[in-house]
Amino acid sequence: MPSPFSMPMIFILVVAVILAGTVSVAGTAPSVTTAATRSTYLESLHTPLTAKWPDNRLVYLVCHGHSVPAGYFRTPTIRPFDSYPHLTGRIVQDRYPTAMFEVVRTAIGGENAEQGAARFAEDVLAKKPDVVTIDYGLNDRWIGLDRARAAWSSMIEAAQAAGVEVILLTPTGDTSANPDDASDPLVLHAGQIRELAEEYDIALVDSFAMFEQYRAGHGTIEPLMSQSNHPNRAGHALVAQELARWFTELEPPAAE
């Protein structure tokens, strides 16, 4: 069916998201039951993010996962500066202009959570990040729910043991999935990731719900996609907006 969004409009929305961090293509993401709240979850980072030289320090966000955070658009093309890790960094840097905010991608195309867990200590924790995001839902369909849960849990627990804050991401859209079918593997993996966020009381970016809100309003997610399973810049900007909110909506700790 014809796209309800023209390319100029998509461009305007993407620019607005990047520069302001306040415009949503699909509206506000549904709330998920978890103890994590944006105003306090990363409150320990409020001081380093707002500090000025010479008192500021590097704040590291590591984005771990598969081809989406790696920046794959239409395979084999990689566009890291149009992907959500980089776009998130731009939004956060605009919010905290004196911060030294560094985003590092440890994502590998084609990887699932078991493979990501196997190299988590060496590739992620060794970098001593302040925050790590985990995004494997799309590829975990090929290993099943039980194996995926075990791998996600191992990464979450390893990060927490190292004092690293964790933000989970549900999968971005896939035009081959049937989100209206409760038994669709992508639906099931998105649900399991939400459960993990609740179980561990950690932050969540519900990318799957945002893409579905867009589909409900526009009849298709095609304007957000570069190919069936990879978002385009507009899709990445949608994820970046929500991820950045965990940093930009921080309130000062009570002691400050």
Residue ranges and their predicted role:
Residues 60-62, 99-127, 139-168:
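Internal alpha/beta domain cores that form substrate/cofactor-binding pockets in large enzymes
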Residues 23-31:
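Signal peptide processing junction and immediate N-terminal pro/mature segment
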Residues 172-256:
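Catalytic His-Asp segment of secreted/periplasmic serine-dependent ester chemistry enzymes
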Residues 9-22:
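Bacterial N-terminal signal peptides
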Residues 70-74, 112-114, 140-143, 175-179:
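A short acidic, helix-capping loop that chelates divalent metal ions and anchors anionic groups
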Residues 68, 76, 105-111, 133-141, ...:
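Cell-envelope and extracellular/periplasmic
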Residues 46, 85, 89, 117, ...:
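Extracytoplasmic/secreted envelope proteins and their assembly/folding machinery
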Residues 33-106, 119-128:
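Serine-esterase "nucleophile elbow" of acetyl-processing enzymes
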